[in-house]
Amino acid sequence: MKANLGNLMKQAQQMQENMKAMQEKLATIEVEGQAGAGMVKVIMTCRHDVKRINIDSSLIGDDKEMLEDLVAAAMNDAVRRVEAATQEHMASVTSGLGLPAGMKFPF
């Protein structure tokens, strides 16, 4: 029984180290969200830090409301891409845990 508990503790510590390493890696991965056929782009890290927003010069001076909508859409696209990239990378860390399908980690 003690051997199993010791083994479990060792696995938990290794998992914690792997999670920390993955979080550091995710902080360096950038994704790009787009809207308006690429006329508005948002570059974001997998920590949800916005690095850049690129707006095509043809949109400057146009309808302010439309531009705001495009920026919001590009941000939302970037967030969805961050979530997908994060899940993909975290799958390598959590694959041996036997978590139920659809269960997100970290919770």
From Swiss-Prot:
SUPFAM superfamilies: YbaB-like (SSF82607). It comes from the Bacteria. It is found in: Cytoplasm, Nucleoid. Keywords: Cytoplasm, DNA-binding. GO terms for cellular component: bacterial nucleoid; cytosol. The keyword DNA-binding applies. GO terms for molecular function: DNA binding. Its main location: cytoplasm. Belongs to the YbaB/EbfC family. Binds to DNA and alters its conformation. May be involved in regulation of gene expression, nucleoid organization and DNA protection. Homodimer. This is Nucleoid-associated protein Neut_0591. It comes from Nitrosomonas eutropha (strain DSM 101675 / C91 / Nm57).
